[in-house]
Amino acid sequence: MSLPASFDLTPEDAKLLLAANVHLGAKNVQVHNKPYVYKTRPDGMNIINIGKTWEKIVLAARIIAAVPNASDVAVCSSRTFGQRAVLKFAAHTGATAIAGRFTPGNFTNYITRSFKEPRLVVVTDPRTDAQAIKESSYVNIPVIALTDMDSPSEYVDVAIPCNNKGKHSIGLIWWLLAREVLRLRGIIPDRTTEWSVMPDLYFYRDPEEIEQNAVEEAKTEEVEEAPVAEAETEWTGETEDVDWADSGATPAAEDAAASNW
């Protein structure tokens, strides 16, 4: 049985996945993740089959697009590298973002102010977002997760095999997922039309690095705006010939010789 054309990985997307190191998996392999291993390197690192990664991205996007109300999809990331990505994903698709620490009882304790009743949960890492997955299992909410080769698969309904520890890998997977959701909703007309949003927008940025870059840019602007004083006259290394007899002036050496010491 052949898959639809949308499940075919394009060369451009394959280059993006490889450039972001999505294919670099962990050395340990959980039994349910074995079908996603393409090969094992001599150093023990497992290479993920990015073709299957793309198939799972398309499948997850179809599940997300099938939810009538976009805000009923909760996207979670306790991992620092994924917090910016889930916020951007929520902004572009209308989902509800839970970035940072997941408050226990968000899905089960209706007394809390942060209580939510999503119809679908998407998490960045089954280990760091274990509380969200556990509560989803209590209230029968399906879970989509970005899973590495060593990630646990309990209560995960759809696993997207990828490197869920690198900031570029996490950002790119969320970007591809958002783009596919927008394609299915018709916001992006067809697959030949490129999305105007760059993947860099989903990448984690270190606040200290941002401040340092801002300081360096300010210094560069100050140096460029400072006026450069130009010399009014240029010395050519040539001396002018002066006729001391006509001018009535005598050189300093002759004055010194004529004086009475």
Swiss-Prot record:
GO terms for biological process: cytoplasmic translation; ribosomal small subunit assembly; translation. One of its GO terms (molecular function) is structural constituent of ribosome. Residues 222-244 have a biased composition (Acidic residues). CDD domains: RPS2 (cd01425). It is found in: Cytoplasm. Residues 217-261 are annotated as: Disordered. One of its GO terms (cellular component) is ribosome. The modification N-acetylserine is found at S2. InterPro entries: Ribosomal_uS2, Ribosomal_uS2_CS, Ribosomal_uS2_euk, Ribosomal_uS2_euk/arc, Ribosomal_uS2_flav_dom_sf. Its main location: cytoplasm. Keywords: Acetylation, Cytoplasm, Ribonucleoprotein, Ribosomal protein. This protein appears to have acquired a second function as a laminin receptor specifically in the vertebrate lineage. A 67 kDa form similar to the human laminin receptor (67LR) has been isolated from the cell walls of blastoconidia, but it does not bind laminin. Component of the small ribosomal subunit. Mature ribosomes consist of a small (40S) and a large (60S) subunit. The 40S subunit contains about 33 different proteins and 1 molecule of RNA (18S). The 60S subunit contains about 49 different proteins and 3 molecules of RNA (25S, 5.8S and 5S). Interacts with RPS21. Belongs to the universal ribosomal protein uS2 family. NCBIfam families: uS2_euk_arch. Required for the assembly and/or stability of the 40S ribosomal subunit. Required for the processing of the 20S rRNA-precursor to mature 18S rRNA in a late step of the maturation of 40S ribosomal subunits. This is Small ribosomal subunit protein uS2. It comes from Candida albicans (strain SC5314 / ATCC MYA-2876) (Yeast). The gene is RPS0.
